[in-house]
Amino acid sequence: MQTPKLAILLALAMAAAMVNLSQAQNSPQDYVSPHNAARSAVGVGAVSWSTKLQAFAQNYANQRINDCKLQHSGGPYGENIFWGSAGADWKAADAVNSWVNEKKDYNYGSNTCAAGKVCGHYTQVVWRASTSIGCARVVCNNNRGVFITCNYEPRGNIVGQKPY
C-alpha cells in the first residue's frame, strides 16, 4: 500500500519541479534584468517590477491564448508584444532580446528607425520616463506558439520625443 503512495508523491514532486523550472526562466527578474541592461547601456535608470502591470499583462495574454495573435491590447500602458512559433520553449529573455536587437535600426540623432525597419520596441525598452514594467507569457492553445507581453508605465514612444 505504501508503494503507490510513494510513487504518487514522487510524481507530484517531479511535476512541481518541472513547473518551477519553467517559471524560473520567466520570473519577474528574467524580464527586468535584460531591460535594465539595455537601459544601462544608454545611461537610463532601472525599471522595477509592477504587480499591477503584471496583472494587466497576464489578463491580456490570457485573451490571446486561443489565437496567439500579435495584436496590441489598446490599454493605457506602453506595450511590447512577442510571438514565438510552436515547437520552441520561448522565454522572457527571448522576447526582451528580440526587442533590444532593434537598437541597430534606431538612429538617435534623427530619432527614427532605418528605412523599412521597426525599432519602437527597443525605444520603449529604453524610454527614460518608463520606470515600471509588468510582463506575462502564455503557451497558446492548438500548437499556435508562445505569446509574451510587457507593459510599461508611464508609457513611452511619445511622438516627437527621444527615448533618452
From Swiss-Prot:
GO BP: any one term: defense response
Role, per record: Probably involved in the defense reaction of plants against pathogens.
Disulfide bridge positions per record: 68-140, 113-119, 135-150
Name of protein: Pathogenesis-related protein PRB1-2
Domain of life: Eukaryota
GO cellular component assignments: extracellular region
Keywords: Disulfide bond, Pathogenesis-related protein, Plant defense, Pyrrolidone carboxylic acid, Signal
Originating species: Hordeum vulgare
SUPFAM superfamilies: PR-1-like
Taxonomic placement: Eukaryota, Viridiplantae, Streptophyta, Embryophyta, Tracheophyta
Residue ranges constituting the SCP domain according to the UniProt record: 34-152
Family, similarity comment: Belongs to the CRISP family.
Keyword Signal: yes
